């Protein structure tokens, strides 16, 4: 078995060596053309060669990123449309969605997941890890729920991008990730670009904003980071099935979501505020709205008033589409963390901010929440793409360095074996 695994490792390393050797040759060609005073056209052709080589070698992750981005954009748009229709019943929609997720994941897992079970997964209970992920997600939702009440839309978008440095810090501290200077530079470019754009937009709006609630919203990113790291540890160490993890996490979230109920009674929640004596009535009205299409809140409601107006007609269709895209979002997120890493998911997910902003330009996607195009959204998108390219360059350098270290270790091991044979 050791011989077979060693043979596979050598095969994989030789394949990677070939990739990086080609990359080195392209880089050296570029250096030669610069030293020889090559034409501008030749330099551009060389850059396009490097880009084509990178895309060809990592085509799967790029296709997966595009699929994830599409699903994520649709998830956020239908979440917004669901909120506009039945925003008075957040607890009902949350619990119903968790129940649907649990049923769907368990059905699919029972049909397809059991065949993939391994010995580590079969002989160990992961209930503690599942519960920990659910609790971390619940803590994140509660903090975000409070923080969003006094955080403007532009600041919300900026806070989302802060997940990059927060994840980098905790992954370095706990998972022992190591970064190149270009990783830090790329992350800074993404965060600073979006910070400048969103700060400018925040000055143009007159919405209520509070630094304390902004900090509460930022703190919501920490449990999300630990939740994703727990997923990565479970995936990488125990090779647990993605469907099983999502099914069990959804099961525990049915109970951990109940922790949010007392939060609704906080008086500063404005339209989401719900007194204790109205909780049960709100739940009954929520189910009537979602499944029967019956409006309850129709008077003294609307923008800037104590309550949102119900728009329950066809709400179940919008909610069903939201649930579908959210389930797909969860599956792809887990897959990216499983096959790649928490940081890969973080970098990929941060493009959703500018992408969602642009998606709201199209009425067939956004529906009633459509808005006019803004130049600053495209500036944000460009900043993200440029920062991501720089970040990826740092990863390539680290991968090449890792391959060289493995080569040196293999060659040292072979020399040791030869020496031992000679001495015998």
From Swiss-Prot:
The record describes its membrane topology as: Multi-pass membrane protein
The residues that the database entry marks as glycosylated are 88
Name the InterPro entries for this protein: CRT-like, Transprt_Chloroquine
**Outcome of mutating residue 76 to T, per the record?**
In chloroquine resistance type 1
Report which residue ranges the record marks as coiled coil.
none
Judging by the UniProt lineage, the source's domain of life is Eukaryota
Swapping residue 207 to K leads to an effect described as:
No significant effects on pH sensitivity of chloroquine transport
Originating organism: Plasmodium falciparum
Q: Which UniProt keywords apply?
A: Amino-acid transport, Disulfide bond, Glycoprotein, Ion transport, Iron, Iron transport, Membrane, Transmembrane, Transmembrane helix, Transport, Vacuole
Q: Which GO terms describe its biological process?
A: amino acid transport
Q: What is the effect of changing residue 207 to N/H?
A: No significant effects on pH sensitivity of chloroquine transport
Family of this protein: Belongs to the CRT-like transporter family.
Describe the protein's quaternary organization and the partners it interacts with: Monomer.
The molecule here is called Chloroquine resistance transporter
Which reactions is this enzyme annotated as catalysing?
L-arginine(in) = L-arginine(out); L-lysine(in) = L-lysine(out); L-histidine(out) = L-histidine(in); histamine(out) = histamine(in)
Any additional notes? Can function as a drug transporter. Can transport chloroquine, quinidine and verapamil. Drug-resistance-conferring mutations reduce capacities for the transport of the natural substrates. Active transport requires a directed pH gradient and a membrane potential. The CRT protein from Dd2 strain can transport lumefantrine or mefloquine.
């Amino acid at each position: 078995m050791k011989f077979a695994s060693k043979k596979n490792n050598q095969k994989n390393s030789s394949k990677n060596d070939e990739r990086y050797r080609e990359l080195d040759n392209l880089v050296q060609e570029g250096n030669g053309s610069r030293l020889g005073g090559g034409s501008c056209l030749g330099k551009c052709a060389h850059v396009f060669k490097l880009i084509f080589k990178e895309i060809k070698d990592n085509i799967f992750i790029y296709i997966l990123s595009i699929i994830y981005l599409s699903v994520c954009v649709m998830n956020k748009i239908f979440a917004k449309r669901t909120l506009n229709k039945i925003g008075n019943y957040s607890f009902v929609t949350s619990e119903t969605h968790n129940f649907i997720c649990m049923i769907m994941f368990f059905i699919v897992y029972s049909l397809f997941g059991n065949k993939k079970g391994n010995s580590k997964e079969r002989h160990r209970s992961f209930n503690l890890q599942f519960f920990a992920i659910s609790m971390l997600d619940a803590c994140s939702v509660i903090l975000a729920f409070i923080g969003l009440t006094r955080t403007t839309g532009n600041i919300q978008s900026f806070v989302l991008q802060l997940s990059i440095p927060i994840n980098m810090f905790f992954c370095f501290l706990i998972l022992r990730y190591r970064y190149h200077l270009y990783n830090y530079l790329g992350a800074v470019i993404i965060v600073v670009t979006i910070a400048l754009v969103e700060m400018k937009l925040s000055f143009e709006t007159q919405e209520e904003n509070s630094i304390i609630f902004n900090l509460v919203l930022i703190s919501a990113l920490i449990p999300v980071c630990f939740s994703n790291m727990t997923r990565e540890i479970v995936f990488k160490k125990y090779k647990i099935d993605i469907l099983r993890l999502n099914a069990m996490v959804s099961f525990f979230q049915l109970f951990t979501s109940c922790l949010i109920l007392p939060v609704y009674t906080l008086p500063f929640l404005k339209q989401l505020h719900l007194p204790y004596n109205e909780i049960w009535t709100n739940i009954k009205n929520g189910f009537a709205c979602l499944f029967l299409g019956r409006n309850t809140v129709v008077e003294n409601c609307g923008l800037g008033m104590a309550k949102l107006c119900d728009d329950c007609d066809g709400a179940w269709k919008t909610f069903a589409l939201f649930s579908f895209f959210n389930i797909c979002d969860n599956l792809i997120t887990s897959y990216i963390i499983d096959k790649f890493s928490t940081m890969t998911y973080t970098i990929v997910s941060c493009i959703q901010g500018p992408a969602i902003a642009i998606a709201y330009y199209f009425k067939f996607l956004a529906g009633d929440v459509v808005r006019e195009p803004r130049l600053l959204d495209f500036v944000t998108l460009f900043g993200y793409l440029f920062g991501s390219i720089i970040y990826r360059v740092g990863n390539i350098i680290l991968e090449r360095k890792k391959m060289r270290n493995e080569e040196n270790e293999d060659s040292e091991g072979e020399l040791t074996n030869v020496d031992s044979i000679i001495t015998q």
